[in-house]
Amino acid sequence: MVPKNTSGSTQTGKNSINNTFGTFGHPLLTLITVISIRWNMGNKFCRYCESILMPNQKRCGACGKIVEDTGNIFSRFERKETVPEQEIAIVENKDAPYMPYKPRELQMDIIMDIKKALDGGRHIVIESGTGTGKTIVSLAGGLEHAKQHGKKVVYLTRTISQSDQVMKELKAISKIKPISGITVTGRNKSCPLFKGEDIDVPPNVLSLMCEERKGRSQRGSSGGCRYFDRTRVVLDNIASFSKENFPTSEELDKYCEGLGACPYEAKKLLMKEFDVVTAPYIHILSEDIRSNFIANLGGEETPLLLIIDEAHNIVDAAREQESFRITMRMIDTAVDECSTMSAQWVGEGIKAEDVIKNIRSTIKGIATEKIGLGKTEYRLPQDAVESPLITKFGFQKKDLEHITDAIINLGERRMDSLLEKGDNSVSELYELGIALKNWMVSDDGRYVKALKLSDEGEYLSAACIDPSDIVTFMRSLKGAVHMSGTLQPLDQYHKIMGLPRDTIARTYPSPFPKENRAVIYVNDVTTRYDEMNRDPSMVTRIEKKIAKLCWNADKNTLVFFPSYKMMKNMRPFLERDIDKPLYWEESGHQKKTMRALDEFRKGKSGVFFSVMGGSIAEGIDFPGDELCFAIIVGIPFPPPSLEQKAMSEMFDMRYGEGLGWKYTSETPAIRKIRQAIGRLIRNETDRGMAVILDSRASKYQRQLEAGLSQDPVADAVMFFEKDSNR
């Protein structure tokens, strides 16, 4: 077991500071001299791009970023007076009439930039640091423009908790201006018949089941929906409750259910009456859902102002939305379902069961031939699944669409018969039919079609690498707000989203004291694949560093790994050598993970092990002492895959040789690290430190605002001693 007071762990003198902050490529004396020269010149250089600045220039003309004082790098561990909590405005702000608070530093700049861009019909892409109040400034700037131009604001969020924050800010705005807002969620989150059930049903399948039940209610047939019947009766009550209380999504759902009404149906009917509608990404990313969503908002004649929260997630979300797979479980259960049906003809003399079995045989054959020892994927040539069907049953390629339509119709009839019996079960035949149709019409230029192998067996994968539909939609908008705390490089986001050339890009730093956060990295370990293979001791050295850091920082600590696999492999050593309360993010077990997280947050010196890019790293706030220390293991470059290779090649062709890897691997990895570091500081008084255990961080020290440390344990002890001496 690692001893709690490791030799050298309490070194807090001159050598420790020199090691941490004096190794940026120059001897320490030279570094001080350079800083002194700059300081005496009035700090006339941009800290980001090194461009010369004019006197009193607030924004760098070269890179567009707000200029900050370089300051004294040795003062970063010192505690200074913190920014006071944001105050409610006493009188209306004439320059920002929808801003309910006394503005913090930079907030008026952001609001003015948003309004100016929107008034000019332009998109604005913003990276805004923690504490700038992304939600309130985007609403304040967006609402002023929307009200003047008769637009409805659609605020897109990745999580329900983010939509709840929008409602909280709208409630504050309502105290100074008449405003209304409502949160919309998907059927699977709001439908009383399916809410809380552990089902993985595609939205289009759930929509069909819902429409069928509503149709039965309207016809007075059995198998209808009692919640739908009640909704219109109490709709005025729901509207009044929403406009008076600005409820969260959960609060509104409970209110509707208390009246015996369907929350989903009520929101759908009411949203056209509200100024602001918050919704998950899928309401815009899915073409089918978007069409219905816009119709419910008032139709094409209702102009929209889109505000995208956590915009760095939108591109991946768009790809995931358009991607799909066909698993052996889907195929096997569809075959079983066919055996219960007396009539299953999908063509002249052709049964659905025979078609599906042929597809299963094709998948098995390709897997046997192409996926050997150590391989888990094989990129399929064009028509690899379709050709055996054509050969077997003797029809033309154009007939395949009729075959899949017939399978879908069989599934619909199957669900009708189940509903007659009061059974909510999904037809596997219908679900498979939809997936097969999508497979056969998906463009090979936009999708990577592959056969893959997992622990559960073989499956067909259609991974979207070019979500052109959302790009087309974004370009059709006359202005939108794209915001995130980790969106750089902004020009890359601009290109991938296909935004107009006149799009405005802005970066705003956090107003919180820089001294409250420290980021350091080490240069003697790495999780780079070839180096870990070449040096068998690398894993052990990383494990020991994690253990020593956890031992010597008597604070709540989050350890972020680049993958679940690495976390699993290191777990036995860490459980043996860290004598503290330990908690783990469990892949595929969300409830278990959340219970562990609740216990971790209640303590003061526990260690929670997680994965970068997961829900803990991006979706959870840890105010105060809930989190003080982050250990980041490695650089989370995505693992090699057919999709990564295809996307990289696509971006190389579009934007220039070498940019493909940067866009698909480097930027997402750095963004994940920045998101993980961002968990540390969530308000003015938070203090936190992050240690990156990977020498490759030296390449990204400017983006990560990190300094090299020769003794991270000593530097962590020194940083947290400032807290104990307060």
Task: Describe the residue ranges of each PLM region.
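A substrate-engagement module of RecA-like helicase motors
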Residues: E81-Y98, K102-E105, K147-V277, L285, ...
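Walker A/P-loop NTP-binding motif
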Residues: K115-K116, T135-H149, K168-A172
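Walker A/P-loop
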Residues: G120-A140
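Signature of the SF2 helicase/ATPase Hel1-core->accessory helical subdomain module
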Residues: S138, S161-D164, K168, E257-H402, ...
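A contiguous, basic/glycine-rich beta-loop/short-helix subdomain that forms a polymer-engagement track
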Residues: L252-D275, L285-N296, I403-T526, R534, ...
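Conserved RecA-like P-loop NTPase helicase motor core
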Residues: N523-S537, S587-R696
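Conserved interdomain hinge at the start of the Helicase C-terminal
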Residues: T527-P562
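Conserved helicase motor "Helicase C" RecA-like lobe of SF1/SF2 P-loop NTPases
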Residues: P562-E586
